[in-house]
Structures are given as structure tokens and as C-alpha cells.
Amino acid sequence: MTIKPFANKPELASPTPHLDAATARIRAALPRFTYQSQKHSSVNNIYEPCNGHSWTSGFWPGQIWMAYIHSGDPVFKYAGLIHSESLLERIKVKRGVDHHDMGFLYTPSCTAAWAITGDENSKQAALLAADQMLTRWQEVGGFIQAWGAMNDPKNYRFIIDCLMNLPLLYWATEQTGNPEYAQKATIHANTCRANSIREDNSTSHTFFMCAETGAPLRGETCQGYNNDSSWARGQAWAVYGAALSYRYTKDPEWLDIFYRVTDYFLSRLPEDLVPFWDLIFTDGDDEPRDSSSSAIVACGLLEMADHVEAAEAENLRTIAGQIMCALAEKYAATGDTDGLLLHGTYSKKTPYNTCTPEGVDECVTWGDYFYMEGLLRLAKPDWRPYW
């Protein structure tokens, strides 16, 4: 299967000026966010400080490390290592870690810090996080339970997002030689692949399994419009997650899944290449966008370009460049904001979902992170992130 670039859409001519602008915004935010974390989403495009208990607290340090890679300024290294210390303390005391999102917390922050600086505290934090992630393992069904009390039938489920958490487990096997981390990551990924991808190549946000037998039960949404729609960010996690699963396993089924879920996402983009918050909506609908989803997909395309033949890799890089151009030209932060990417959506309430409404048409910290990652991938083709 192949995916063709969009007709008559420009690629990003030069990512460097946009990286410079993003790095300047990160630098300006350091006085507020060196010893505190950013909240998951902004209020009127300004982030509030928080205590670092959120599942999103790894994305701001991840931005700091990318600013360090781009600029070489030691002020970013200093700030990044302070966040590593905080994350090490958090995992040691088990504060806000009883869930599956250890990868989102510790991969862009601590595995990055370890790779860049050799900081042993960062390595220790990430390995402890991998151990914590395995405490969510459910042998009956073969998956990592996302949230809630273990073995409670009301919480006996996994979610599409977790594909992005799995690289932490593969990394832990690489670091320790213990195959259990990677083995369970692969089993979870295969369980997700078998159940979360629908026949039309859209995705279910969450999927329930039977606590007694491990049999698949049903897909439900938490943050999408309804149980049958495709939440834009969930579809984006599937795109990038499939690329990463293919990288780590070389299982050709993941290559097939990547093309299927990517085609679904791209075919439902509005004219400006930035989706509404659920892919059920398109041009003409009066709904908020989710710019973070396009940034995630651009990074997934650039990841998969490393693993396919040259002609197809060029197609994937071109599409990623077109998406990043759309983001940089129309959605990048301007004016009085400490975010990098405008018009993200964390969770929008509908009569049919179960989420708490937060961060609608705001900056979201993972949107900023993946926008920066996409720019850095384009500017430094030999650089690879830490997923």
C-alpha cells in the first residue's frame, strides 16, 4: 500500500526559523516552569503551573531537551535535569503513577535526559517507571490496564493511547537485558491491534475485555464524540503507535495497520490539513480543531519513513512536510502565549462521551511537544526522538 502526498499543498520550506521561535518561547517560559510543571492545557493560551501529578508532565521537559538539542544552550540542560530529579522523586514515592501512562511521563523526559547526558538519576527514574507500568499488566486478556482499580470489570480495558507508552518497555529491555518488558509490550500491542482497529480503519478510544475469560467485549469512547466515531487524537496515536510497533517488532501486520489508520486520518482532514477534534466532523462543521493530532501524525509519518523503501519514504516525508507547513503557517503560537501550537483540544464533552470538558481550543502540552519534535525531525534528518 502507498499513500500519495496532497495535491497543491506546500511543504515546510525551512523548519529552522520555526524551531528558533519555539526555542525562544520555551526559554521565556523557564522562569515559571523550571521548578514546576505546566498544566496539561492552557487557559486563554497561558499555561498554569501545577504540582506535576498529571499524565502529561513529561512533555514540557521533552520540549526543554529538544530546545537544548537545537540551541546547545546549557540553561536547557540545567532545567531538564531538574525535571528529571522531580520525576525520580515522583516514581519513588508513587505519586500519581497508578495508571499506564509511564511512557508519556518518562520517555520524552528521562530517557531523553539519559540519552543526551548520561544522567544516572534519569535512567533510574525511567526504569522504575517501566516497572510501575508492568504493575498494570493483566494476564487474562494480555494487556496493560489503563486506569482504575485492577480487576474491576468497570475498568478492565486498555486504550489506543497506550501504543505510545510501549517504547518505554522496549527501552527497559534494551537497558537491562530482561526480556519481560518487551514481551509484554508486544503482547499488549497485538491485543490492541486485534480489537481497537475497526473494519473501516477507524479506531476505538477504549476497549473492554472480560475480566474472567479475557475475551474481547466492546469498544467505547471517553473523549471522542460517540462510541462509533473516531476521536482525532486517538486515531493519531494509532498512526504513530503503529509506526513505533513496526520499528520494534518488524511485524508486517503493523506496516499494514499503519497504512490503514493513516489513510483514514488523512482522508478526513479538512482543507487546511488540521482535523476537528473528532474525525466525524469536516469542513463546514462548527466544531473546535485539534492541532495536536496533526502534529502527532506528522511525527508518525516521519518515523515510518525510516522503515520503508526510498520512494515510499519520500511520499511519507512529503506529507509530513505538508502537515508541518500547515501547522507552522496557521497554527503556530503568536502573541501573548507560552505555548507553541494554538487550537488544540484536550477533551470536549458531548451527550455521548464520559470525559470532563477541559482545554477546548487551547494550547495542549503534548501538541507543543509533537510540533517541536516534527520541526526537529525535519531540521535534523539524522536525529531521532526517544520513543
Go through each PLM region and give its residues:
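Glycan-recognition and catalytic cores of secretory/periplasmic carbohydrate-active enzymes
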Residues: 1-387
